[in-house]
Amino acid sequence: MAFDKDAFLTALDSMTVMELNDLVKAIEEKFGVSAAAMSAPAAGGAVAAVAEEKTEFNVVLLEAGAAKVSVIKAVREITGLGLKEAKDMVDGAPKNVKEGVSKVDAEAALKKLLDAGAKAELK
């Protein structure tokens, strides 16, 4: 079986976050591994602390604003939820729309919400 790494990476690049999540779960089940990060043992002595840049962000919907229907559509597009679930999320604001996503994905989701007329922020 020929393996084309570039084709594989292209396929991964075209997948949605939900599809990638399903892929990770399938790989964990198939090979009996976990995608959880391994923690390194504590270092002894005086080691300078390195300030780490935040890599995971939450997109928080603060309120729907005047354009509630547009915000519900944006939430559905971002999360893949059904109409009722998206409406419940918007009605229950403040709510996390996306959790633990990369900065690029979080900024894209935030832009969609703001463009729809919602008040939202990154945490």
UniProtKB/Swiss-Prot annotation:
GO terms for cellular component: cytosolic large ribosomal subunit. GO terms for biological process: translation. SUPFAM superfamilies: ClpS-like, Ribosomal protein L7/12, oligomerisation (N-terminal) domain. The keyword NAD does not apply. Keywords: Ribonucleoprotein, Ribosomal protein. One of its GO terms (molecular function) is mRNA binding. Homodimer. Part of the ribosomal stalk of the 50S ribosomal subunit. Forms a multimeric L10(L12)X complex, where L10 forms an elongated spine to which 2 to 4 L12 dimers bind in a sequential fashion. Binds GTP-bound translation factors. Forms part of the ribosomal stalk which helps the ribosome interact with GTP-bound translation factors. Is thus essential for accurate translation. HAMAP family: Ribosomal_bL12. Belongs to the bacterial ribosomal protein bL12 family. This is Large ribosomal subunit protein bL12.
